[in-house]
């Protein structure tokens, strides 16, 4: 189990993030129209997986906004914003904020969190996804990972985006 912190208190995750060079585990998530989104849908494209507990928190919302801004200039890259929020909440947030360059998807009925070792095991956020980023190359290999040390802080956007090159 990996360790992260929530408001200064250590909490464990359900496992470890995949290692750089590993194949990303196949996944199925749910988009804002309740349609299935599969890792197979992105074959041949680079992926940035912006993973967070809930879009209804300030830091999570900020991460979606910042990756949305960055995604506008990325080539052959899809940015997935992933939480266990219901698809309706993700859609409402993105509509209200004018978010159009990222793909919001929900892991609410998926093993995505377990498969990537990022389900929070403790803290008041138990069961939600830990704030993390996974960058995947066009061949499905993990190029970068970050488990953010303090859930209430933002990920390292620059490092994640640099891993695309």
Curated annotation (Swiss-Prot):
Disulfide bonds join 60-94. It catalyses: a hydroperoxide + [thioredoxin]-dithiol = an alcohol + [thioredoxin]-disulfide + H2O. It is an enzyme of class 1 (oxidoreductase). Residues 18-165 form the Thioredoxin domain. Its EC number is 1.11.1.24. Keywords: Antioxidant, Disulfide bond, Oxidoreductase, Peroxidase, Redox-active center. GO terms for molecular function: thioredoxin peroxidase activity. The active site is at 60 (cysteine sulfenic acid (-soh) intermediate). The active site is a conserved redox-active cysteine residue, the peroxidatic cysteine (C(P)), which makes the nucleophilic attack on the peroxide substrate. The peroxide oxidizes the C(P)-SH to cysteine sulfenic acid (C(P)-SOH), which then reacts with another cysteine residue, the resolving cysteine (C(R)), to form a disulfide bridge. The disulfide is subsequently reduced by an appropriate electron donor to complete the catalytic cycle. In this atypical 2-Cys peroxiredoxin, C(R) is present in the same subunit to form an intramolecular disulfide. Homodimer. Belongs to the peroxiredoxin family. Tpx subfamily. This is Thiol peroxidase. The lineage of its organism: Bacteria, Bacillati, Actinomycetota, Actinomycetes, Mycobacteriales. The gene is tpx.
């Amino acid at each position: 189990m990996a360790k992260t912190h929530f408001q200064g208190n250590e909490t464990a995750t359900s496992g470890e993030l995949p290692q750089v060079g590993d194949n990303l585990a196949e996944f199925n998530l749910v988009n804002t129209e309740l349609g299935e989104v599969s890792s197979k849908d992105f074959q041949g494209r680079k992926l940035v997986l912006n993973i967070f507990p809930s879009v209804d928190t300030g830091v999570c919302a900020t991460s979606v906004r910042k990756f949305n801004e960055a995604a506008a200039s990325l080539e052959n890259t899809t940015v997935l914003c992933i939480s266990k929020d219901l698809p309706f909440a993700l859609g409402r947030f993105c509509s209200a904020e004018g978010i159009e360059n990222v793909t919001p998807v929900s892991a609410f009925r998926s093993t995505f969190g377990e498969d990537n070792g990022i389900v929070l095991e403790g803290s008041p956020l138990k069961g939600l996804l830990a704030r993390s980023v996974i960058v995947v190359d066009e061949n499905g290999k993990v190029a970068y990972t970050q488990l953010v040390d303090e859930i209430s802080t933002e990920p390292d956007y620059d490092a994640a985006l640099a891993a695309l090159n």
